[in-house]
Amino acid sequence: MKYSDLRDFIAQLESRELLKRIDYPVSPHLEMTLVSDKVLRSGGPALLFTNTPNYNMPVLTNLFGTVERVALGMGEESIVALREIGKLLAALKEPDPPKGFKDAFSKLPLLKQALNMAPKYVSGAECQTHVWEKDEVDLTLLPIQTCWPGDVAPLITWGLVTTRGPHQSRENMGIYRQQLLSKNKLIMRWLSHRGGALDYQAWQQEYPKERFPVAVTLGADPATILAAVTPVPDTLSEYAFAGLLRGQRTRLTRCIGNDLHVPASAEIVLEGYLEPGNEAPEGPYGDHTGYYNEVQSFPVFTVERITHRDKPIYHSTYTGRPPDEPAILGVALNEVFIPLLQKQFPEIVDFYLPPEGCSYRLAVVTIKKQYPGHAKRIMMAVWSFLRQFMYTKFVIVCDDDVDARNWQDVIWAMTTRMDPSRDTVMVENTPIDYLDFASPVSGLGSKMGMDATSKWPGETQREWGKPITMDEDVLNRVNGYWSLLGLK
């Protein structure tokens, strides 16, 4: 599905009955979380709350509440087509040299697409139709959700943060939650290895006493949002990839108060800065783990300016014990990851991140095993190849006769093909999500790899068991007269 901006996407979802307008008054304080959660768990539509008490602004939730809507946001019609996006990313990440003239000619469409990705810069953008400055800046006028009873304050959850490090031309996009502190201040919660945090660290080293410019987009088009959470190659900007998904170049405009660029069709843009050394305690908040996280200090974002479209829409979500919207996104992006992994490791048959594993903390991989120790190589590959998996705590590797997405299959393989001592790999002192309170030190913990493959000579001294299967002729014969037996 192709679309121009968030409003066009909303209109097309509504025409397909994939979005529901809620005219009854629903409060962003806890109530929207409960309504959105009930609808998401039933596989229901995206929600547009048009009657938000005490606020003159509608709220959009559950935009990516089904895999189908994630696929539509990426310009496709089904989850199956997401594999093609993964193949495209794999080709852009590590292009193969042409094998000849015919092969080179066949690669021209991809080259043409890549060349057409560059963003288009415009002035007079819709997102700057209205401008709040100085005393007009008031974040409390936005219907920012309070998601859970123990949350310390309202929380911006779909803030698309744009930064740029010193001496860099490429702008980084990331989605980081932001705690409301006051009318013009938020707390920017980003982990130290994320792009925005790295840009800020580099800035402080280069300009230790100068303010760091930041822009936050609320209500970007889905392709731009999804590009920010997709493993885009470092040589390609997220804006360029979003243009590829959308089928047209991303329109960007320069911020009024700094030289960062934001989507021209964004609903709301926050412009401001981080002051080196100015931090505040963030949290606690209910998170995607299903628990409240501990309090930790992060930089304070001072908002100097708010710009917005006519009648802006506030885009929001909640996070909690799966399934939630991040978990659904994880299921969809799982399909994008597979071709990326398979290009580097062709022996991988399937790769699965169960949503109940908080989107990324556990992975099941099936392979065509080729040599002793092969499973351990795949474990190391998962942990190191894509930065999206640096927080994956558990990796289970199985043979290709196992369905990675069927726990009955996986548990059967684990209990019949694993010796706990021989087939368990423990790696200590590795990067761990600081929200993972199970680790002994914040941000640092262990990982476990489990080899549930059949063992080859060199891995065992015993004769390995042969799986029981029925004779094919008997199977076909019985299936042929099954309907005559009077059995269901």
Swiss-Prot record:
Disulfide bond entries: none
Positions of prenylated FMN binding: 175-177, 189-191, 194-195
Entry's cofactor comment: Binds 1 prenylated FMN per subunit.
Biological-process GO terms, alphabetical: ubiquinone biosynthetic process
Keyword Transcription attached: no
Biochemical pathway: Cofactor biosynthesis; ubiquinone biosynthesis
Cofactor(s), names only, from the UniProt record: prenylated FMN; Mn(2+)
Catalytic machinery residues: 287
Keyword terms, alphabetized: Cell membrane, Decarboxylase, Flavoprotein, FMN, Lyase, Manganese, Membrane, Metal-binding, Ubiquinone biosynthesis
PANTHER family named among the record's database cross-references: 3-OCTAPRENYL-4-HYDROXYBENZOATE CARBOXY-LYASE-RELATED, FERULIC ACID DECARBOXYLASE 1
Protein's recorded name: 3-octaprenyl-4-hydroxybenzoate carboxy-lyase
Native source species: Legionella pneumophila subsp. pneumophila (strain Philadelphia 1 / ATCC 33152 / DSM 7513)
